[in-house]
């Protein structure tokens, strides 16, 4: 698998985390309070590392995800700091810039990902999944600390699962808010590890 093929596969796998379905009902008062706090976050930045393990490929990259109401941007860089891929989403459309200087644009991110992967998928929920919100999951489970522990979803013929393996306290509005800093995305033959080393909540 070439670097370009891996990047396209990783991007599509990451975005698949936001595919629509119906979540289970959770009535914990503590969880509802935590969920409401997360839902007030609209602007944030997340920096970290990712590891991809597939049947015939392993990759390690750094990532930077910037999200606001006006713009979402995902940048993947190599260990040497070279940009491998940059995805930008605005109300006007979406653009992908690759490591080999190719630029692809579309009216929306769904169309762009379809051109890259041949799959139609929504990207709207990705910021929520990073924050630990189970927006439109098939099923999910909570930890004893009333944070999101796992997500399950059926995507085509594949069963995907996100495990939230570790949280860290982030200072926000004069309080501490537990946010994910280690996630694992798995399906039958693919594993993607995400480690978020820094959160910056700007609103």
From Swiss-Prot:
BP GO terms, sorted: lipoprotein localization to outer membrane; protein transport
Record Gene3D superfamilies: Lipoprotein localisation LolA/LolB/LppX (2.50.20.10)
Membrane-protein topology: Lipid-anchor
Entry keyword annotation includes Metal-binding: no
This protein's UniProt keywords: Cell outer membrane, Chaperone, Lipoprotein, Membrane, Palmitate, Protein transport, Signal, Transport
GO cellular component: cell outer membrane
Presence of keyword Membrane: yes
Principal location listed in the UniProt entry: membrane
InterPro entries per the UniProt record, alphabetical: LolA/LolB/LppX (IPR029046), OM_lipoprot_LolB (IPR004565)
Covalently lipidated residues, kind N-palmitoyl cysteine: 19
Lipid attachment locations (S-diacylglycerol cysteine): 19
Highest rank taxon of the organism: Bacteria
Subcellular location: Cell outer membrane
Assembly and interaction partners: Monomer.
Similarity field: Belongs to the LolB family.
HAMAP family in UniProt: LolB
Function recorded in the entry: Plays a critical role in the incorporation of lipoproteins in the outer membrane after they are released by the LolA protein.
Protein name, as recorded: Outer-membrane lipoprotein LolB
